[in-house]
Amino acid sequence: MEDLEEENFSLSVSSPKDAEFDNVVGHLEDIIMDDEFQLLQHGFMDKHYHEFEDTEENKLTYTTIFNEYIGLVEKYIEEQLLQRIPAFDMSAFTSSLQCHREEIAGDIFDILLTFTDFLAFKEMFLDYKAEKEGRTVDLGCGLVVTSLMSSSISSS
């Protein structure tokens, strides 16, 4: 008779706080991927990207744009989360972010970071500006595939 290998499956039990956090992140993913959010964010960036320059100096207008962005985008996300999770508390969620930093997908964390980190916000605008002005790197451009096999095999 064949020996059957036994597999141990362990059930991961998370705390109610962790489950709540995971629930919020799931909803955040849905909100951020939604066309309405994408239009809101890109519309805002289209309106202001020309103001940003890739220099060490930060213009005073950046602060105004940053505050307007927070007022618009963070408010939108918070309203969407409150519709989905009536007891949602943005400040409690924001404070728990650092504990769960490694668990959050990059795109979501980057967007959340733009609410609190001015440099992340500025970098987002500079990347957007480079894309709009066609200054992004196209890694597929100029690649050539060459066969390592000789096209003609000589017979002896």
UniProtKB/Swiss-Prot annotation:
Any one cellular-component term (Gene Ontology): spindle
Primary residence: cytoplasm
Keywords from the named record: Cell projection, Cilium, Cytoplasm, Cytoskeleton, Mitochondrion, Nucleus
Gene3D superfamilies: ADP-ribosylation factor-like 2-binding protein, domain (1.20.1520.10)
InterPro entries: ARL2BP (IPR038849), BART_dom (IPR023379), BART_sf (IPR042541)
GO BP, sorted A to Z: maintenance of protein location in nucleus
Residue ranges of coiled coil: none
Protein location: Cytoplasm; Mitochondrion intermembrane space; Cytoplasm, Cytoskeleton, Microtubule organizing center, Centrosome; Nucleus
Protein family (similarity comment): Belongs to the ARL2BP family.
Summary of the function given for this chain in its UniProt record: Plays a role as an effector of the ADP-ribosylation factor-like protein 2, ARL2.
Protein name: ADP-ribosylation factor-like protein 2-binding protein
Organism for this UniProt entry: Xenopus laevis
Gene responsible for this protein: arl2bp
